[in-house]
Regions:
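Outer membrane beta-barrel transmembrane domains
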Residues: 64-68, 72-75, 242-345
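Residues that define the transmembrane beta-barrel architecture of outer-membrane proteins
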Residues: 49, 81-85, 123-131, 164-166, ...
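Transmembrane beta-strands of outer-membrane beta-barrel pores
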Residues: 57-63, 103-109, 137, 174-180, ...
């Protein structure tokens, strides 16, 4: 039972801020709090010990211009810096279920051509909030090894962690249109001026919200053998009808990779993971027609460091693109940095 509860809390310290689409509307941060190895079974605690909180951050730098997957010149130096901070509050109901609320705070700085002029600005505010249910679908632990410490009259039995564990969690949820979607109104006023440089940053890239109720479906798996581990995350967003006649396409994000715990003690964990992340998103629709500059398929590689001490858990990682296949003209990511810190009460 204890190990199931631990997995509900750690098989999430990946900032799933799962891979994000071209407009950088990142997935839900689900802290993998299993690394909080010092936790005890909730059955021996008060009801409030089921609560946990987290803060996740994703920073993405967009400064490379591509047309249909090919890099082209960026004579105007257009770019977008996107920061998405997610505030997370959750409660572990029992050994199988946990509820989680995600509230994103977004800040975006940009520079783009607008006709023959240069438009600089910022956009900030509340994004689209999400309510998630996490369900442990499967969990297995090998028999724990037991040793005896002989230091007095009576030997003391010490039970060690299992050498092998495997767990799978299902993720279901609903995203609410709490973010301001007024930037989408720009789509009504866009015109091409002959001879003027083209912009790869539009209202759908800067909007704080999609204006739609969306379904969230995903899975997270965690496998460990002694100090070697493997984690995977998949998140699919089923988009509803948006506002301003603009409808975002469904998107799929995934991540995973092997890692190694250099330190794994009862109260302290430090590990390094080689992470591969990817995303797929079809083109959006505006006024019933395809918005050609919104589709993307990408793969990123990078390291991720995870650590925990008692009830605290943290992670940080960097991702660099190895393949980006986009539609039409877009400003695509140069790199992405993720981080998070979580606490189980």
């Amino acid at each position: 039972m204890k190990s199931l509860r631990l997995f509900l809390l750690v098989s999430f310290v990946a900032v799933v801020a799962m891979p994000s689409d071209a407009c950088d509307l990142c997935g839900c941060y689900t802290p993998q709090l299993e690394a909080m190895s010092g936790m005890e079974s909730q059955s021996s605690k008060s009801w409030w010990n089921g609560f946990y909180g987290a803060v996740g951050e994703q920073f993405t730098r967009f400064a490379t211009v591509q047309i249909d997957g090919r890099e082209v010149a960026n004579p105007t130096g257009q770019y977008e810096n996107s920061s998405i901070t997610q505030l997370v509050a959750g409660y572990i109901i029992n050994d199988r279920f946990a509820l989680q609320l995600n509230i994103p705070l977004i800040y975006r700085e940009f520079k783009r051509p607008e006709g023959f002029a240069i438009d600089r600005g910022t956009e900030s505010g509340l994004g689209d909030a999400s309510l998630l249910l996490k369900t442990v679908a499967f969990h297995y632990s090998s028999p724990a090894r037991r040793t005896f410490e002989v230091g007095g009259k009576n030997p003391i039995a010490i039970e060690h962690e299992p050498d092998f564990t495997f767990s799978a969690v299902l993720l279901t949820g609903l995203k609410f249109p709490t973010g301001d979607s007024s930037r989408l109104e720009e789509e009504f006023h866009e015109i091409d001026i002959p001879g003027a440089p083209l912009s790869g940053i539009h209202g759908h890239d800067l909007t704080l919200g999609t204006g739609s109720f969306d379904g969230i479906f995903g899975e997270q798996t965690s496998l460990r053998y002694k100090n070697i581990f493997l984690e995977t995350n998949v998140q699919f967003t089923l988009r509803g009808d948006g506002t301003h006649q603009y409808h975002f396409a469904n998107d799929l994000g995934w991540s995973g990779g092997p890692g190694y715990y250099f330190i794994r003690r009862h109260d302290t964990i430090i590990g390094l993971q080689f992470d591969v992340t990817g995303e797929y998103k079809d083109v959006d629709r505006f006024r019933g027609k395809a918005a050609e500059d919104t589709g993307i398929t990408s793969v990123f590689l990078g390291p991720r460091i995870v650590a925990s001490r008692g009830r605290w858990s943290a992670e940080i990682g960097a991702e660099f693109p190895v393949s980006i296949d986009n539609t039409a003209l877009q400003v695509v990511p140069d790199y992405r940095v993720r981080g998070g810190i979580s606490l189980h009460f």
